[in-house]
Design a protein with these regions (language model features):
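Negatively charged, low-complexity tracts enriched in Asp/Glu with abundant Ser/Thr
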Residues: 1-24
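Short intrinsically disordered terminal tails
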Residues: 1-2, 68-75
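Short amphipathic alpha-helical "recognition" segments used for binding
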Residues: 8-9, 29, 73
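Compositionally biased non-globular segments, especially hydrophobic aliphatic-rich helices
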Residues: 11-13, 55-58, 69
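Generic detector of ordered, mature protein regions
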Residues: 14, 19, 36, 71-72
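Acidic, low-complexity, intrinsically disordered interaction modules
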Residues: 19-65
Length: 75
């Protein structure tokens, strides 16, 4: 999966790009972020102390499964 494919999937599912090029979305348990780098993505949640990593994975290992969900991230 490429960075552009990940951004396209995320924006179709309600994620919004912030000014730093990361994707954010509000959930019942708080703000989540997909922090994108050149080769990897991290799924993080906002805490009172900053961002905490929930899962991460290299873009080459990420894919969209049959249910339309992101697969390939490790905890």
């Amino acid at each position: 999966m490429t960075r552009e494919e990940l951004i396209a999937w995320a924006t179709r599912n309600g994620w919004k790009l912030d000014r730093w090029g990361h994707l954010k979305k509000e959930f019942d348990n708080g703000t989540h972020r997909l922090k994108l780098s050149r080769i990897a993505a991290r799924h993080e949640i906002s805490t009172p102390f900053g961002w905490a990593r929930l899962a991460s994975g290299y873009l080459k290992n990420l894919s969209i499964n049959a249910d339309g969900k992101l697969a390939g991230m490790n905890r």
